[in-house]
UniProtKB/Swiss-Prot annotation:
Name by which UniProt lists this protein: Multidrug resistance protein MdtC
A single Gene Ontology CC term: plasma membrane
Species of the source: Salmonella arizonae (strain ATCC BAA-731 / CDC346-86 / RSK2980)
Keywords on record: Cell inner membrane, Cell membrane, Membrane, Transmembrane, Transmembrane helix, Transport
Molecular function terms from GO: xenobiotic transmembrane transporter activity
Main localization category: membrane
Gene (UniProt): mdtC
The keyword Cytoplasm appears for this protein: no
Membrane topology: Multi-pass membrane protein
């Protein structure tokens, strides 16, 4: 009593305190960062290593395996995967959430250093690492185009100057430059000319390497001066290499341009990048794990004027893709939804109270509670994201509930003729315990979420804390500011025998009378209501089992990512044509705004594309509908497939797959994996629950096996090293020397001129100089035959791995897809030597599925414990929790009606319903118990009177919560995929709960009361007189 009086009778102090915490909230709002979702990035580090010309199997055994053994000893590694392709190895390390990325990076560098002695000596550089996840879509893509600069020159400028500058921006994890390679002097050898001159390829290599030397020469000095010695020991351009003498024949000099073409070109000619229909260099920028995407993009944009100033006029720099506009638009939509929710909730209060003054009180309580929450969010290190703003939107209905309960009870006393300050004090005193019970039991729902581990726990933590803080502040406001305003703003009124005869008042009276009549009938037919109650429990179980489930709603971020997979024996020239064909098909779609793509490098038969769609308001179709439409056209391209997927704000795992979900096959036997992977992939491709099936297991690449006749080689004076060196010099794009320039270092690349290596006959022109100086053709000591070979070798841990990626057809849920895969694996009878498991998002979905029921039961148990403590009873909490089955049925039926799968967002809705719908029962039970204690009423009379007396606040609080969530259901535009499941669940649950709990709660109350009396009689003992 004294606590409430302290604030009621000191209005100035109360107002100033409320104003102070509101100002703190406004300041917190201005300081809060903006993000699409809470930070849930796993710390990921990518290690790269290269050995030009090495086969995938060589890279896997000699480079990947030593690095994996060393990196696998690092503490906190959650998963390690590797992919080795032609001349390149990439290892992805995914760490636990609690691992600091910078500390992990130091351990990675130490592990690389430890493995260095085990790596091949011919590697041109040490392995490097980047603190970025290569499977994440770039947060921004910049393109460079020019009509006068070559692709190599553009690439050099981009990698030497732009990429270096961008990489230094806070939040940037990696800048991947694609579309070409660094400039180089390329030497294209003529095998026939070399044979005629008697010059071996190794002799050419050694001559070039010896002619381009960068060594210190020292200095000369006397008593007065000092002279630095400088020589012309370096060759920097093709023109300087052309007259280089590499051999003498019969006293005549054989120069390099006599036996080769020497050109200024690029290190790897098998690279191509495009933006729309124009050749381009791409700068793909990825953020560091656990950094804010909006802040990073803003920092890059702030740097763009400086970058533009660095760029020559002949180069055009454009932003081809930016993830931030759709994120900002989505957050703006949520903010508008929040504003609409506040307005609707206040409108509900006004319609019930029909008083401007009375409505002003909750109209003040709502913004004070919500705005003050921003201060707590800032102190907790949260961000303004879709989930935290959705929490505030839902909180609108909660925070007004407490104020409504207090206000309605005070209004009831005022209508009875009590003085305002007395009514405020007594009304607050009467419902204070009720309000505290409702708020604490609602906050208790979120305790299991706060204790939940893994990615789902981290994802939902901000939502739970934000909502809990808003409810806590609302509780304080409703017991301090609300009664104070009631006491000083509202006036006493004479008792009304027929109150509210107009509009909503008449409707409410009619509803209350109808409810009273129907409640009497229900209380006389309790068995029928009991059957209905038990039926809702059974229906909950059936609906939960039957409803399709997924991990997270499929988002439309306005960005698509595509992976090209062509025939494994395709040439680079043909692959570049496929890229152009696919880009044209996509560019012609009316919903597409921009297309960029690249191909080449170590994976000749693959490519990547990034597609920016028009803003949501300028297109009718969703991203998934656009993918479905394009899929039909893309399948008509012969010899290649383009797999499209919508970029999501949550991307789990480090695998760079061509679809949204992955299923990984592991085996310690590579032969077993190669035998079973095609069978499993074929069986999965026949499933209607899966689409876009593809695999990173590629072992049908064209290979030419050379079989050396070692006896003949020994007789001819040739060793294996010389033969292998010949092949590397001829066909490996071998980097034989380095050109040092002020801004960068460039390579001299040697190979047989492509004009002489267009078919297998090129091998017949190869020869080796033996120990006697004679030219021995390769065909003298080697035979060759075509065969199949892997284009890539993949590991997970230290096991051979193959990942099958898949998308979901429209109308199919992730649960249906995973069930179909598990069923197929069982039917195939896959041996124990081949193990299958879901990866990435599908793996987290499986883990979440296993814990969902446990989480719901934990929330119910927590609420029961809190209510049991508050009521000092084992029975009354059960009465209150009896409202939950009807809410669950309503939520699940609403999801089915809207064809929405049960996702993590829907789970949040169910958890919220556990907290919301019990409020009705709390108000009924509180007043019934008080009526029994102080009024001497029977349980039947007490619960009947409580139901009628609390009918108006029950309707007000339920409608307020319902209208607070309704904008989420009706919202469209960016980000609506996230908001709608939450709104659907809450509104559906509230509608069904309101229809049933007004009748089932009194019946359950009487059932437990009779049960209590029955047990008390059994336990009572007769008194014996002595």
């Amino acid at each position: 009593m004294r606590f409430f009086a302290l604030f009621i009778y000191r209005p100035v102090a109360t107002i100033l305190i409320a104003a102070a915490i509101t100002l703190c909230g406004i300041l917190g709002f201005r300081l809060l960062p903006v993000a699409p979702l809470p930070q849930v990035d796993f710390p990921v580090i990518m290690v790269r290593a290269s050995l030009p010309g090495a086969s995938p199997e060589t890279m896997a055994s000699s480079v990947a395996t030593p690095l994996e053994r060393s990196l696998g000893r690092i503490a906190g590694v959650n998963e390690m995967t590797s992919s080795s392709s032609l001349g390149s190895t990439r290892i992805i390390l995914e760490f636990n959430f609690d691992r600091d990325i910078n500390g992990a990076a130091r351990d990675v560098q130490a592990a690389i250093n430890a493995a260095q002695s085990l790596l091949p000596s011919g590697m041109p550089s040490r392995p490097t690492y980047r603190k970025a996840n290569p499977s994440d879509a770039p947060i921004m893509i910049l393109t460079l185009t020019s009509d006068s600069w070559s692709q190599g020159e553009l690439y050099d400028f981009a990698s030497t100057q732009l990429a270096q500058t961008i990489a230094q921006i806070d939040g940037v994890g990696d800048v991947d430059v694609g579309g070409s390679s660094l400039p180089a002097v390329r030497i294209g050898l003529n095998p026939q000319a070399l044979f005629n001159q008697g010059v071996s390829l190794d002799e050419v290599r050694k001559a070039i390497d010896s002619a381009n030397v960068r060594r210190p020469q020292g200095a000369i000095e006397d008593n007065v001066h000092r002279w630095q010695i400088q020589t012309n020991d370096e060759l920097k351009t093709a023109a300087e290499y052309q007259p280089l003498i590499i051999h003498y024949k019969n006293g005549a000099a054989v120069r390099l341009d006599d036996v080769a073409s020497v050109t200024d070109s690029v290190q790897d000619v098998r690279n191509a990048g495009m933006t729309n229909a124009k050749p381009a260099i791409l700068l793909m920028i990825r953020k560091l794990p656990e950094t804010n995407i909006i802040q990073t993009v803003d920092s890059i944009r702030a740097k763009l004027p400086e970058l533009q100033a660095m760029i020559p006029a002949a180069i055009d720099l454009q932003i081809a893709q930016d993830r931030s506009p759709t994120i900002r638009a989505s957050l703006q939509e949520v903010e508008e939804t929040l504003a609409i929710s506040v307005a609707l909730v206040i409108l509900v209060v006004f319609l019930f109270l029909r008083s401007g003054r009375a409505t002003l009180i909750p109209a003040v309580a709502v913004p004070v509670s919500l705005i003050s929450t921003f201060a707590a969010m800032y102190l907790c290190g949260f961000s303004l994201n879709n989930l935290s703003l959705m929490a505030l939107t839902i909180a609108t209905g909660f925070v007004v509930d407490d104020a409504i309960v207090v206000l309605e009870n005070i209004t009831r006393h005022l209508e009875a003729g009590m003085k305002p300050l007395q009514a405020a004090l007594q009304g607050t005193q009467e419902v204070g315990f009720t309000v505290i019970s409702m708020s604490l039991s609602l906050v208790a729902v979120f305790l299991p979420l706060l204790l939940m581990g893994g990615l789902p726990g981290r994802l939902l933590r901000e939502f739970a804390v934000t909502l809990s803080v808003a409810i806590g502040i609302s509780l304080v406001v409703s017991l301090t500011l609300t009664p104070m305003m009631c006491g000083w703003m509202l006036k006493s009124s004479k008792p009304r025998t027929q109150p509210r005869k107009r509009g909503v008042g008449r409707l409410l009276v009619a509803l209350q009378q109808s409810y009273g009549t129907s409640l009497k009938w229900v209380l006389n037919h309790t068995r029928l209501v009991g059957v209905v109650f038990l039926g809702t429990i059974a229906l909950n179980i059936w609906l939960y089992i039957a409803i399709p489930k997924t991990f997270f709603p499929e988002q439309d971020t306005g960005v698509l990512m595509g992976g090209i997979q062509a025939d494994q024996s395709i040439s680079f020239q043909a692959m570049r044509g496929k890229l152009q064909d696919f880009m044209k098909i996509i560019r012609d779609d009316p919903a597409v705004n921009n297309v960029t793509g690249f191909t080449g490098g170590s994976r000749v038969n693959s490519g990547m594309m990034f597609i920016t769609l028009k803003p949501r308001g300028e297109r009718k179709e969703s991203a998934q509908q656009i993918i479905d439409r394009l899929r039909v056209k893309l399948t008509k391209e012969p010899g290649a497939r383009l797999f499209l997927m919508a970029v999501q704000d949550i991307r789990i795992g480090g695998r760079q797959a061509n679809a949204s979900y992955q299923y990984t096959l592991l085996s310690d036997s590579l032969a077993a994996l190669r035998e079973w992977e095609p069978k499993i992939r074929k069986a999965l491709s026949a499933l209607p629950q899966l689409a876009d099936i593809n695999s990173d297991h590629q072992d049908n690449g064209a290979e030419m096996n050379l079989i050396y006749d070692r006896d003949t080689m020994s007789r001819l004076g040739i060793d294996v090293q010389a033969a292998n060196s010949l092949l590397n010099n001829a066909f490996g794009q071998r980097q034989i020397s380095t050109i040092y320039q002020p801004m960068n270092q460039y390579k001299v690349v040697m190979e047989v001129d492509p004009r002489y290596s267009q078919d297998i006959s090129a091998l017949e022109k190869m020869f080796v100089i033996n120990h006697d100086g004679k030219a021995i053709p390769l065909s003298y000591f080697a035979q060759w035959r075509p065969a199949n070979a892997p284009l890539s070798v993949n590991h997970q841990g230290l096991s051979a791995a193959s990942t099958i990626a898949f998308n979901l057809p429209t109308g199919t849920s992730l649960s249906q897809a995973t069930e179909a895969i598990n069923r197929t694996m069982t039917q195939l009878g896959v041996p124990p030597t081949v193990r299958g498991s879901f990866a990435g998002t599908a793996q987290v979905f499986q883990q979440t599925m296993n814990s969902q029921l446990i989480l719901i039961m934990a929330a119910i148990a927590t609420v029961y414990i809190v209510l049991g403590i508050l009521y000092e009873s084992y029975v009354h909490p059960l009465t209150i929790l009896s409202t939950l089955p009807s809410a669950g049925v309503g939520a699940l039926l609403a999801l089915e009606l809207f064809n929405a799968p049960f996702s993590l967002i829907a789970l949040i809705g169910i958890m919220l319903l556990i907290g919301i719908v019990k409020k009705n029962a709390i108000m009924m039970v509180d007043f019934a118990l008080e009526a029994q204690r102080s009024g001497g009423l029977t349980p039947e009379q007490a619960i009947f009177q409580a139901c009628l007396l609390r009918f108006r606040p029950i309707m007000m609080t339920t409608l307020a919560a319902m209208f607070g969530a309704l904008p989420l259901v009706l919202s469209g535009g960016d980000g609506s995929e996230l908001r709608q499941p939450l709104g659907i669940t809450i509104v559906g649950g509230l509608v069904m709960s309101q229809l049933l709990t007004l009748y089932t709660t009194p019946v359950v109350y009487l059932f437990f009361d009779r049960l209590r009396l029955r047990f008390s009689r059994k336990n009572s003992k007769p008194v014996v007189e002595i």
